[in-house]
């Protein structure tokens, strides 16, 4: 199926996110929703760690249009509900996290799993099945080490999270693991574009681009 409207590529630092992508172990083409840098202020300097691209299954566009068509980019960017609809919507999402600085798998997965577990426990929804999903998540990342230009790839399906690793800008044909856990699938993308998401730049890009797509749909 052709995209309802054309979307453009996005350059983040020296990394280019193409307008469409086919994730590992998939035959479907996903549209680039938005992309941006993740960084932190350290000692008065903004240190950039990763470039993050958020891709959406094309079925997301008509689904989102019912509620959000006609809204401005600013309205979407300021709406917690808009990003929640992307996170929890009944369509697949694909997140590409490309390293700007080197990182070990344990450093990455440790922080993500710590945040997920704390969030679930605070909400009173943590279960033994979630604990097993986190264990598997940590195991998948444990032997990994990432250099600048390498990518961590997540396919967010409604009931599962598929994890892949790409080296030097390549998108692999196969995935490394599938974790059957709805909450983990949503939590990983929420960590990027949720209310406390780590990449305000990716959120702004997503709101701007999706507003344009919906208003031409």
Swiss-Prot record:
Highest taxon, organism lineage: Eukaryota
GO molecular function, one term: chalcone isomerase activity
InterPro entries, per database record: CFI, Chalcone_isomerase, Chalcone_isomerase_3-sand, Chalcone_isomerase_bundle_sf, Chalcone_isomerase_sf
Pfam families to which the protein is assigned, alphabetical: Chalcone (PF02431)
Metabolic or biological pathway, per its Swiss-Prot or TrEMBL entry: Secondary metabolite biosynthesis; flavonoid biosynthesis
Enzyme class: isomerase
Residues that, per the record, bind substrate: 50, 115, 191
Catalysed reactions, as listed in the record: a chalcone = a flavanone
EC code: 5.5.1.6
Site (Important for catalytic activity): 108
Organs and tissues of expression: Petals.
Keyword Nucleus listed: no
Annotated GO biological process: flavonoid biosynthetic process
UniProt keyword list: Flavonoid biosynthesis, Isomerase
Protein purpose: Catalyzes the intramolecular cyclization of bicyclic chalcones into tricyclic (S)-flavanones. Responsible for the isomerization of 4,2',4',6'-tetrahydroxychalcone (also termed chalcone) into naringenin.
PANTHER family from the UniProt entry: CHALCONE--FLAVANONE ISOMERASE 1-RELATED (PTHR28039:SF8), CHALCONE--FLAVONONE ISOMERASE 1-RELATED (PTHR28039)
Misc: Part of the biosynthetic pathway for all classes of flavonoids, a large class of secondary plant metabolites, many of which are brightly colored.
Family as reported in the entry's similarity comment: Belongs to the chalcone isomerase family.
Name used for this protein in its record: Chalcone--flavanone isomerase
Record organism: Eustoma exaltatum subsp. russellianum (Bluebells)
